């Protein structure tokens, strides 16, 4: 089974981290971009087929999404699950995890993956139900982070959170607008799982009940909430700030 990846950063990331998955690459004919030539040189050296096509063909393949003149057809990645998460955590001393509960927009998933990578998160955990798929759009928005940050799909999110607490000694912190303690009042330097809920609805009840602590982002203006990917960035980089200072 194959899937498409588009955008220079996303294709570069697959080339760097999983070149064996590349099947063929489509490039816009006449495209002049200094970032493209090193990519083409690497593809040629690996013997990966490159086809130069017109814009109409690329636009059709990308379903109208921005593709930056390059699309790769790749073998579908293996879906990671709870067992893979245990292996990842076995080698980490002070892990930071991002948990997304009910985030169904692929743009938001991609943005959260990109931020998770920048913040040093070892994995992003999502439930199998009511969660965005790692589509071409999500990979494009992730800007290569979809190949570097493991995306773990779990059958039962509440059970996974309990396992993190009991078997990996990870503190589970959930975000909730009504929480009286803000992220800036919380100590977030140890092994941690940050749980972000869907926009509007927030975390599901069982997810909330399995959090060790609830925190909020203080809002100084008239809006009552932030986009989930923006809120994720605020929270993750407050955690990064605290860790750097500890």
Swiss-Prot record:
It catalyses: guanosine(2251) in 23S rRNA + S-adenosyl-L-methionine = 2'-O-methylguanosine(2251) in 23S rRNA + S-adenosyl-L-homocysteine + H(+). Coiled coil: none annotated. One of its GO terms (molecular function) is RNA binding. GO terms for cellular component: cytosol. It is found in: Cytoplasm. SUPFAM superfamilies: alpha/beta knot, L30e-like. Its EC number is 2.1.1.185. Pfam families: SpoU_methylase (PF00588), SpoU_sub_bind (PF08032). Its main location: cytoplasm. S-adenosyl-L-methionine binds at residues 197, 217, 226. Keywords: Cytoplasm, Methyltransferase, rRNA processing, S-adenosyl-L-methionine, Transferase. The keyword Cytoplasm applies. Belongs to the class IV-like SAM-binding methyltransferase superfamily. RNA methyltransferase TrmH family. RlmB subfamily. Specifically methylates the ribose of guanosine 2251 in 23S rRNA. This is 23S rRNA (guanosine-2'-O-)-methyltransferase RlmB. It comes from Haemophilus influenzae (strain ATCC 51907 / DSM 11121 / KW20 / Rd). The lineage of its organism: Bacteria, Pseudomonadati, Pseudomonadota, Gammaproteobacteria, Pasteurellales. The gene is rlmB.
